[in-house]
């Protein structure tokens, strides 16, 4: 009988029976009782592969032929010489020496005498015992009426020379007497089932079915076909067919008679191609809230209604050097008339009130604890080199020489006309008589939306504003406005500042696709600026045409300043750091960012450079090369190169349309957070809400410019930046399109408790008139008759109209306060 293997079974080469095997099968089927003890198959058809292994002195007298295949050892096994096989033990042969020793200790359990084992370990002997024990367990050679020992005990006995493979009667009785102590479970011995079924024989010729020409294997295959795992996972490369007779005869009890078919799955047919499918969900508030729940998981559970109350009432400690508190003449809190409440919960914060503790928290984060990351440098020489590098990298020398005109007077009159409601020419002070080192301080009432999932552990703090009063700002703002306009005119073509009348983020004939982006994120930008940055600004202003004495004067009262928050009674000295509300804030931050960028990177490798305050973005064909570590070691900045970098600046994504032009799109994640704003004042005519709506429409004017190409870009850039699903962006854009259509749709996103109360109180029943109840029935009838007369216009006394109407009004007011049941009884 041919050797069985899974490969031969699957390709159909195993199972070809000889005439001798057919005769043996017929004889065994005719008289099964006489088969026991009879020779199974002629010896010429079964080739037994065995090896005689000789061993060293540690395994003396042992061989596979003499010790384990002799008649004295297995005399109870009929046909043992012809059926004993050498089973494969590849899983043991592949083990290392140490792993085999561990297995040897577990199975053989030798006795340890120090470093000596009894019996000693021999790799060849142990592997032979494993093979022989496996053949004894697997091959059907043992007496079915007796119980074999477990496999580890078989290996131990064979290795020790004790050839006892069966359990004794006492051991079998001990095993059978063991009962399960777990309630609800019962165990009973199970007889070994052969599961042998005789192959089908042809009634015409008497041959086995698959050898008979009358046997229709195709019909049998169709009848026995079942859905298996192969229908879900097609297996290719299987050729040949295994019929039931061959499968059962050779595998016996190891397999069930199941007919297997292997076919390829058909290609799915789609009515609409996947690339043309679009979401068709109707835009609703619930759908928008579901997007917020999945995109901002920590924001939807965030409620800071009482956070500031906790700060005001809890114990408070803060570490700030040289701070002064004045609690005697604090300004009273401004009482407002309430705010509209958003329907969407997007994690927006409540309006912050500038109390003493809130201001101290903001100063601690925004002004105090200045980082010290840079080393010692020559400030004068380094500032001159950085300013000169700035001019060579960004400025067009020819334009700078020809554009030497600065129109300060016209800018001054434009500034005064803009603020004429609060400022006049008579209010302008004498700058020589003013202390320009003194700055006012306040905290912003609104908090910038957070896009990180940290609201469950971190409370956002408001930003601070350090500013001069309007009369002083009006003296410097026209000068810096004129300088900034000249600065924009003299820039090279590849540099863009997205502010003012001559520049924006809409770039013609430029595509952001197929380019490398470089975005530098600068943390703690305002308070990290020191004397080096101040000297760099002074050098650049002098090169742009600012009078030297004015630039020096401006820088002098920025070296050491004093800020004071009158409302909170907090004041402290600061030095060098950026004043966030003066006339030079945006211009100065942009100059500092550009100068640091030019020193750390070669700007000639970029096709486009965009700067705005502390934001920067560069586009290049090749990967940018530079040293961003200089931001920290030289300029005292906490800088991070954004990876993966996307075209994103000023909270906007840059996209390219089908005509090769670039336009900007506000960040959808920030816009959806603004829809849940809690700082819109409550007005009777919705003036504030309408202003908020118009601002929302102005920011989303790009919607008419969007098509499928730009939406695909936006979805991809959104996934790269935030690592969130970009499929929600299409639904968000649909919501933006709905709520920018008209103001009535936008009003669905906000409500007011006062408006709800007024709406409830507007519903009244004018016909329900209730008289005062008395104990006598006559008074009740009289009240009913009087009420009936009042309801009849023909019988009503016009001389008592005013009196009756006042009574009806009083009774209606009492009806609202009485229970409904009592009122209905009295109204009859």
UniProtKB/Swiss-Prot annotation:
Pfam families attached to this UniProt entry: RdRP_2
InterPro entries according to UniProt: Bromoviridae_RdRp, DNA/RNA_pol_sf, RNA-dep_RNA_pol_alsuvir, RNA-dir_pol_PSvirus
Basic and acidic residues bias (residue ranges): 782-810
PROSITE patterns with a match to the protein in the record: RDRP_SSRNA_POS
Catalytic activity: RNA(n) + a ribonucleoside 5'-triphosphate = RNA(n+1) + diphosphate
Segments of this protein annotated with the region Disordered: 776-828
Enzyme Commission code(s) on record: 2.7.7.48
Domain of life: Viruses
Keyword Aminoacyl-tRNA synthetase among UniProt keywords: no
Role summary: RNA-dependent RNA polymerase which replicates the viral genome composed of 3 RNA segments, RNA1, RNA2 and RNA3.
Protein name: RNA-directed RNA polymerase 2a
GO BP term, example: positive stranded viral RNA replication
Quaternary data: Interacts with replication protein 1a.
Family designation: Belongs to the ssRNA positive-strand viruses RNA-directed RNA polymerase family.
Alphabetical UniProt keywords: Nucleotide-binding, Nucleotidyltransferase, RNA-directed RNA polymerase, Transferase, Viral RNA replication
Molecular-function annotations in GO: nucleotide binding; RNA binding; RNA-directed RNA polymerase activity
Annotated ranges, domain RdRp catalytic: 515-628
């Amino acid at each position: 009988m041919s050797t069985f293997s899974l490969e031969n079974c699957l390709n159909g080469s195993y199972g070809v029976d000889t005439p001798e095997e057919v005769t043996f099968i017929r004889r065994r089927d005719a008289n099964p009782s006489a088969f026991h003890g009879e020779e199974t198959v002629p010896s010429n058809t079964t080739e037994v592969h065995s090896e005689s292994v000789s061993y060293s002195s540690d395994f003396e007298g042992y061989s596979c032929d003499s010790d384990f295949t002799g008649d004295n050892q297995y005399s109870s096994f009929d046909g043992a010489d012809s059926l004993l096989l050498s089973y494969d033990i590849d899983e043991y042969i592949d083990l290392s020496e140490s792993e085999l020793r561990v297995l040897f200790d577990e199975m053989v359990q030798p006795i340890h005498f120090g470093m000596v084992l009894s019996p000693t370990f021999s790799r060849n002997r142990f592997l032979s015992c494993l093979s022989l024990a496996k053949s004894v367990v697997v091959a059907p050679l043992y007496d079915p009426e007796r119980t074999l020992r477990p496999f580890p005990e078989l290996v131990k006995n064979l290795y020790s020379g004790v050839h006892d493979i069966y359990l004794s009667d006492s051991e079998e009785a001990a095993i059978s007497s063991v009962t399960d102590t777990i309630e609800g479970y019962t165990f009973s011995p199970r007889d070994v089932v052969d599961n042998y079924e005789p192959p089908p024989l042809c009634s015409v010729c008497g041959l086995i079915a698959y050898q008979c020409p009358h046997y229709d294997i195709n019909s049998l295959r169709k009848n026995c076909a079942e859905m298996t795992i192969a229908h879900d996972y097609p297996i290719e490369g299987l050729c040949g067919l295994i019929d039931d007779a061959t499968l059962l005869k050779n595998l016996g009890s190891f397999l069930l008679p199941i007919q297997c078919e292997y076919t390829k799955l058909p290609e799915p047919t789609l009515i609409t191609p996947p690339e043309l499918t679009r979401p068709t969900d109707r835009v609703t508030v619930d759908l928008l809230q579901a997007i917020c729940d999945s995109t901002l998981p920590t924001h939807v559970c965030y409620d800071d209604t009482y956070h500031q109350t906790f700060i005001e009432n809890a114990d408070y400690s803060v570490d700030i050097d040289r701070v002064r508190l004045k609690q005697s003449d604090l300004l009273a809190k401004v009482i407002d008339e309430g705010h509209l409440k958003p329907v969407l919960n997007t994690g927006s914060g409540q309006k912050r009130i500038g109390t003493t503790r809130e201001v101290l928290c903001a100063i601690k984060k925004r002004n105090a604890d200045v980082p010290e990351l840079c080393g010692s440098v020559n400030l004068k020489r380094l500032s001159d080199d950085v300013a000169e590098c700035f001019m060579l990298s960004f400025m067009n020398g020819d334009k700078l020489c020809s554009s030497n005109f600065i129109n300060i007077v016209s800018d001054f009159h434009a500034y005064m006309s803009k603020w004429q409601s609060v400022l006049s020419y008579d209010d302008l002070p004498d700058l020589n008589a003013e202390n320009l080192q003194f700055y006012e301080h306040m905290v912003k009432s609104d908090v910038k939306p957070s896009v990180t999932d940290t609201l469950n552990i971190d409370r956002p703090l408001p930003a601070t504003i350090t500013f001069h009063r309007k009369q002083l700002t009006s003296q410097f703002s026209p000068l810096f406005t004129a300088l900034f306009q000249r600065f924009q005119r003299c820039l090279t073509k590849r540099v863009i500042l997205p502010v003012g009348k001559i520049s924006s983020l809409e770039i013609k004939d430029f595509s952001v696709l197929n380019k490398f982006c470089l975005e530098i994120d600068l943390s703690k930008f305002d308070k990290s600026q020191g004397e080096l940055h101040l000297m760099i600004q002074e050098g650049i202003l002098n090169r742009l045409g600012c009078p030297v004495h004015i630039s020096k004067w401006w820088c002098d009262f920025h070296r050491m300043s004093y800020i004071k928050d009158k409302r909170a009674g907090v004041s402290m000295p600061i030095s060098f750091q950026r004043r966030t509300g003066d006339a030079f804030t945006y211009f100065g931050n942009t100059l500092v960012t550009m100068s640091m960028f030019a020193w750390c990177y070669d700007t000639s490798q970029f096709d486009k450079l965009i700067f705005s305050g502390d934001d920067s973005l560069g586009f290049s064909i090749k990967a940018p090369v530079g040293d961003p570590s200089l931001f920290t070691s030289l300029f005292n900045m906490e800088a991070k190169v954004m990876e993966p970098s996307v075209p994103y600046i000023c909270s906007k994504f840059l996209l390219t349309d089908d005509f090769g032009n670039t336009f900007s799109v506000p960040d959808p994640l920030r816009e959806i957070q603004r829809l849940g704003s809690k700082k819109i004042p409550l007005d009777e005519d919705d003036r504030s809400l309408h202003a908020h709506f118009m601002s929302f429409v102005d920011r989303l004017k790009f919607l008419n410019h969007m098509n499928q190409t730009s939406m695909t870009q936006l979805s991809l850039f959104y996934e790269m930046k935030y690592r969130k699903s970009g499929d929600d962006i299409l639904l968000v854009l649909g919501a933006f399109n709905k709520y920018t259509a008209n103001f009535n749709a936008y009003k669905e996103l906000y409500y007011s408790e006062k408006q709800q109360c007024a709406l409830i109180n507007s519903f009244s029943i004018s016909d329900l008139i209730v008289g005062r109840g008395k104990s006598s029935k006559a008074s009740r009838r009289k009240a009913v008759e009087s009420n009936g007369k009042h309801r009849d216009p023909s019988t009503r006394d016009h001389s008592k109209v005013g009196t009756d109407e006042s009574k009806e009004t009083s009774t209606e007011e009492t009806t609202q306060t009485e229970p409904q049941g009592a009122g209905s009884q009295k109204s009859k």
